[in-house]
Amino acid sequence: MASGAVPAGRGRTGQNPVMPSRSNVLLRGVVSGAVFCAGLLVALSASAADASTASIVIGADEIVLDRPQSEWSQAYLQWIAAFARDSSPVADTSGASCTARQQGDVWFLAGSDGTAPVTRTCAVPAGKTLFVPVVSTVERSGNREPDCDSMARIAADNITHRVSRLSMTIDGQAVDNLASHRLATHDCFALGLRQSPRSVAKTAVADGYYVMLQPLPAGPHTIAVEARFDSTPLSTTYRLDVR
């Protein structure tokens, strides 16, 4: 349900979030100067933390590797759709599937299905741009003639009215203004073939919140995302070893 995509099955539009994819108190000293210095130190620390996060997070309107980020959301969902349900990275509870079918310079962190909080451990090659789903929804045409405009309206309604409490931290530092990281595909796209060679590729539209990150420095990092879809809390923690 959440940090991934919304598969068919539940909710007023027949969707379940996937999931890609189930964040001083100053002592009142006698010496006012000491309090001022402590306050200044806290302010500078907060400023440094914000600057550090801002240097990692890529704005949603920025082009990444010659593609708008809405196209990267399509690529993420097509990556997820290529797996059978029981082998999907979205169903992975440990991180064992984090490297499955990853290719290119953008590395997808799979969302979760919302059934329970998930913590995954994953080794990520150095130099990879990270694509992190927070929460998203997918509308599929099934075997019907696709009505892309109508499907896009339903997907947008799901995100606008059913999603709340967005949160993301990188190494304990909050990512601000997650609302600005909403991506919608608008046009229909092929979600891929999985059932049989004779299957017709399902057309789909998607809407949701995703965050693209600059390659992280080598070493351990923790990314945590949370959201709520209707009354369902969604929580995924990624413990990454960049090397």
Where are these regions (language model features)?
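Bacterial N-terminal signal peptides that target proteins for export
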Residues: P17-A34
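N-terminal signal peptide c-region/cleavage motif recognized by signal peptidases
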Residues: A43-A46
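N-terminal segment immediately downstream of the Sec signal-peptide cleavage site
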Residues: S52-S97, V242-R243
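Extracellular-facing segments of soluble proteins and assemblies that are Gly/Ser/Thr-biased and enriched
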Residues: V106-F189
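A glycine-anchored, Pro-Gly-centered beta-turn/N-cap motif
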Residues: K128, P217-P220, A224
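Aromatic sugar-binding surface patches on proteins
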Residues: G192-R194, R198-Y210
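Short acidic/polar inter-strand loop motif in beta-rich domains
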Residues: R228-S235
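C-terminal edge beta-strand
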Residues: T236-D241
